A protein has these predicted regions:
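N-terminal intrinsically disordered/low-complexity leader segments
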Residues: 1-13, 76, 211-217
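Helix-turn-helix
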Residues: 17, 21, 25-59, 63-67
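An amphipathic alpha-helix signature
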Residues: 19, 62, 91, 95, ...
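Hydrophobic alpha-helical connector segments
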Residues: 63, 77-111, 165-169
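A short secondary-structure junction motif
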Residues: 68-75, 108, 125, 143, ...
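Helix-loop "lid/cap" segments that line or gate small-molecule binding pockets
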Residues: 83-84, 99-106, 115-123, 202, ...
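Amphipathic alpha-helical packing segments from all-alpha helical-bundle domains
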Residues: 92, 107, 113, 117-119, ...
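Hydrophobic/aromatic-rich alpha-helical bundle segments in the mid-to-C-terminal region
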Residues: 130, 138, 152-201, 211-217
Length: 217
């Protein structure tokens, strides 16, 4: 039993090395331009070793997307846990949350990798991104809808369609940053804050509940 553990650790390390090398090559060359030989050279393994783990390039590509998605989702859901839960300073708190969300989705390495692949390969190989569509935007939208529901139940927001509101919020907070990130630039802190604040103000104009000021005695 114990004798098998070093071999298992070695296999795990080799698999991780292949995934990291494949991610780098796919990001650089795209799916169609990447070759197993190039991935093998980058991972310092043989071509046959890759085929021992993954039967074809498409299988390897799907494994890479799943691996990156797992890491990205772990970071993303830690951000979702910081969603504001009260009406106090809602604009400021939602703005800070939107900044953290964009830093996780758009500005980190995994987020950039996924978006680059989606833009470059999604149209030609839509089936390869089923995992991304189901477990990326879909999960985030559902989680946000549930979070907005809590604020709606407290009378802070007036939302009829929570799923639509969640999609609109996501569209607002990253729309102005998409091209910046697509061309390989990292948005400045000032741009992240301005974009988030404008998005939140627009969102609250649509869904925020305005309570009348108390009457003067």
């Amino acid at each position: 039993m114990k004798a098998g553990r070093p071999a298992q650790r070695g296999q795990c390390a080799k698999r991780l090395s292949i995934l990291e090398a494949a991610a780098a090559v796919f990001c650089r060359e795209g799916f169609s331009g990447a070759s197993i030989d190039e991935i093998a050279a980058e991972a310092c393994v043989s071509r046959q070793t890759i085929y021992n783990h993954y039967r074809e390039k498409e299988t390897l590509f799907t494994a890479v997307v799943e691996d990156v998605m797992d890491r990205s989702n772990a970071a993303l859901f830690s951000v979702l846990a910081t969603f504001p839960d009260t009406a106090d300073n809602l604009e400021n708190e939602l703005t800070a949350f939107a900044v953290r969300l964009n830093q996780s989705c758009l500005c980190n390495h995994d987020g950039k990798f996924l978006r680059k692949l989606v833009y470059s390969e999604g149209e030609r190989y839509p089936h390869l991104f089923e995992t991304w569509r189901q477990h990326g935007p879909g999960k985030v939208g559902s989680a946000l809808a549930a979070l907005f529901s809590r604020l709606a139940h407290k009378g802070v927001l007036a939302i009829d369609d929570l799923d639509l509101a969640a999609r609109q919020f996501l569209a607002l907070v990253n729309a102005d940053l998409q091209m910046t990130v697509l061309f390989g630039e990292t948005p400045s802190d000032d741009l992240l804050e301005r974009t988030a604040r404008n998005a939140v103000r627009t969102f609250l104009r649509a869904y925020g509940v305005q309570h009348p000021a108390p009457a003067e005695a």
